[in-house]
Amino acid sequence: MNLDVGELSTRQLAEKGISKAQLEDRDRSVDLGVEASMRKPYGIISAQALHDVGGASEGTELRLNYQYFWQIDPRLSLIPNVGVEWLSDKRANYYYGILNSEVARGVDAYRPDQVFIPHVSLGANYVINEKVNVFGVAMQKFLPNKVQDGPLVDQSSQTNFYMAVNYKF
C-alpha cells in the first residue's frame, strides 16, 4: 500500500478545507508474513497475516480468501475470488487517516482505526507453451464508511488490475 498526495484531487481536497501542501505521501509498506491454505474440491481457502517491518505504518493486515479454479480448456483457467482484509489501527490510520504532522499543519484529525475491506476479483491464467504463461487479475475492493468518511478518500470502491508473465527455466 502507498498514497501519493500528487494523485489526490485538488478540488475535492479544497472542498474539505485541505491543500496538498498540508499532506504527506504515505510510504509503501514492506510486509513480512505467513500464509496458510487448504485446497479442497470446492476451491481454496487461504489466510494471510502480514506485518509492516519496513516502518511505514508498523501495522498489521490479516486476509481471508476463497478462490475456485475453473478450467475452461487445457490452456485457460478462470479464478474467481472473494475475501476480506482486516487492517489494524496503525495500518488503517497511516493510509486512510490524517497523520499527527498533518494535524500540526492545520488538517482536522481523522483516524478510521481498524477496518474490514471486502473484495472480489477475477483472475485468468493462459498457458502459451510449456515454459510461458500469462496471468491477470481484476480486483474490486469495497471501502467501508469509516474509510469513505475520511478526507483522503473520495470513492466507495477501488479497482486494481495486475498482470504477469511467467517463464519456467
Residues covered by each model-derived region:
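Outer-membrane pore/translocation modules
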Residues: M1-N65, Q71-I79, D89-P112, V153
